[in-house]
């Protein structure tokens, strides 16, 4: 699928990046927008978190099925169908205020999200040369992260200046753009998922590979903290009377991602993930604590820079680590596990941290969420020390 072993930026890889940015931007605008819309509609932050949880759990359940069928489906056709499916779901939600119906639609959108993102990740990793896997996944991760960070920011800005209906209209347009780009995808039988023999395996073997478990669990912990930011940063901003300025948090993260990702991918390939995970963890802890104690836009912005550095490094490093630990025919499985772990972190973080916020306030919640990163770095350190001992033995 690529003309040169060492070439990364082929036309097809660039196309996948464009589709990924557009699709993630759409879905994350909906994630941030639905949470705020339902919270204001019901005057219940927990219901706002349920909207995110329903969406993410649907994606988590869907991904293993996608991994099982990866060898049997026409990826381009399924991708196009799922994009149209998500478009129809958004159209139905336009003008609706019945919360059970909106939750049901979010579940359906989660199914579309789970299938589509797994297909895009597998297409991308099969286009990336092995010797540039860290760099390639870094760029793919930048595409997903730009959508993930800019989406909530744009949603906040639109809701402050326009309406939820206008936000839905914009997301419909983005899905149409993604669909248009997807028509130009070319799938050849030389892809690793096409040329790898299909082995007789149990259901568990199809959807799970223990070699990818640790990086997937660690990225889940990180995304629990990010869920707290996506779903509740607006509430903290209202307490501090920042208004629409709170959306700058996501803009700063997006800028940091663009600046950091190209370098972090090369560091991963040349030096390994340990030179990225340790400093990123420290930045994340400091960033969350600064959010908790921020009393103005300056401290808020510094927190965004530090957390943005962590976000820029964590997601692609753990995903590349997971993919590198499995065989070629299990790349789809590793990608599905990694993406499902991110979704699980978002799904668990929303209601759990929402409950914590109800007890301690938003500041207490962000302070306590930093403990998740402490657990992450301790588990990573334990694995790192174990690897060192095994190398010396």
Outline where the language-model segments fall.
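Juxtamembrane intracellular "pre-TM" segments in multi-pass secondary transporters
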Residues: 1-9, 187-216
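Helix-loop boundary and gating motifs at the non-cytosolic
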Residues: 9-49, 226-235
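Residue-level signature of mid-helix packing/kink "hotspots" within the transmembrane helices
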Residues: 56-64, 148-149, 254-262, 347
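Helix-to-loop junctions at the C-terminal end of transmembrane segments
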Residues: 62-74, 261-272
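Structural signature of the two symmetry-related core transmembrane helices
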Residues: 77-91, 275-289
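Paired small-residue
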Residues: 100-108, 298-306
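Cytoplasmic helix-loop-helix junction between adjacent transmembrane helices
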Residues: 107-143
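C-terminal membrane-cytosol helix-exit motif in multi-pass small-molecule transporters
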Residues: 172-192, 379-383
